[in-house]
Structure formats: structure tokens, C-alpha cells
């Protein structure tokens, strides 16, 4: 197993997702270092035998000319991850290369979840607004902030964040230098 397979992945963004939650831009910046060294698994399985990849770098990328539903510049937390390019991972690598395994979801802990309508922190109570509904023309969603921890990213069929997923991949042999992708 002298070869590794490296791929870029969009972990999450500050866009409102399918669960009517979004990360603040500041929380994306807080999550970036927390995801370095975290594992990539399938379907949020917590079995160590299901670990497939590991994140070795993260960065925030502003999507020029694109904005979130609430008018912020769209920013994505992106990562570089690697896995062994061996027989055990061959089918997963083929599925990634073919665009079949593409979507991902993250697991993390956020200390705050503020309602877009009233501004109250749902983690502290005091908000009866329902995410996904409109109140006086304003969409109700929660803004997640104050990152406490990052646990993993998972390959999933339907991610909460529509744009989360694999964006580019590389294969390296022992003769090539992984620094080239940094």
C-alpha cells in the first residue's frame, strides 16, 4: 500500500440547509482547525472498521458572486482528505471517481442555535418559531455558531447541506510528493 488517494471535499457552508439550519461564517472559521485529523466514514457509522479517510487540511473559500438565501456572501468550509489506494478501498475510489459517491455530511457540536425570526438561542429555550415556516415574509431557520467540536464527515446519500461533497481527486504513488496538493 505505497499509494494514497487524495480528494477535496466541501464539508459545509453558510447556506441554509434542508433542515433549515446554517453555519455562521465565524463558525466555519472555528470549525476549520477542528476538522483537521478527523475521519471520513459512511453514513455516520461510529464503528472504527468503517473509517475510510482522514482530513489533513481545511480552508474557507468564498464563492465569488454567490449569496445565501439571507444575503450573505456564500462561504464554504473545504477540506483535503486522503485514504489508502488499496484493494480494500478500490470500489469506493472508483465510485468517487465516477461521481457516484459524492455527497457528504458533517458531524459536529455547536454551542448556539439562534432563530432567524426572534434571535433567541434555541439551546437556551424561549423560541416557539418553526424552522422552515415563514413569519411576515421572513424564512425561519437557525444559525449555528460557537463551534465546540468536530467529530467526522460521512459519505451519505442525501446531505442536509446541498453543496457538500467531493470536488476533486488525485492519486499519488510513493515517488510523488503529497506536498504537491497542499
What do the PLM-derived regions correspond to, one by one?
Residues 1-181:
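Signature of dsDNA virion morphogenesis modules
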